[in-house]
Amino acid sequence: MNSIPIYQVDAFSENLFSGNPAAICVIKEWLSDETMQSIALENNLSETAFVNISLKPFYIRWFTPESEMGLCGHATLASARILFDEYIDKNSSEIIFQANRGRLRAIKKGDLIYLDFPKDFPNPIANNEKIIDALRLKPKKLFKGIDDYLAILDTEEDVKNVELNFEKISELDARGLIISANGVNT
């Protein structure tokens, strides 16, 4: 295997050792899924992004140390920073990424980078016992998006006081569980 440039970027911060770290691997041809998974495991960061710069738009994939992810915001932001700084024309102000889920745009304005992600419109679903077990209460409304469940509780106070069962959350058929409620001032 040829050498692969790997960058570690702390997204959302200008200070060293702060922010949200991600590894960025810039490649010109795809590696096997097993190799990318092994690299992510060795990097041991929450996400490692693989950006294939030989494809237009640039194709991007994200791996945790355990598995491939469908989408990762901070690793996309970090990837855009590396590409703007090191790989594309300095006058460019936009990068289009192609991901398994669709296209993502990174727009550079001055020193800032803005991301435009595909929309996710969660659909209402019936309550189910797994969610109730994870929340230890019955949500007022429940929705399922592409990656996550969204549980709407009765009150803001319920959100503050919920005692989650993280073991049950890890058993859900989703990346995560988002909890919300109408606030007092809404």
Language-model features, listed with the residues they occupy:
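Active-site proximal loop and beta-alpha junction motif in alpha/beta enzyme cores
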Residues: 1-71, 77-186
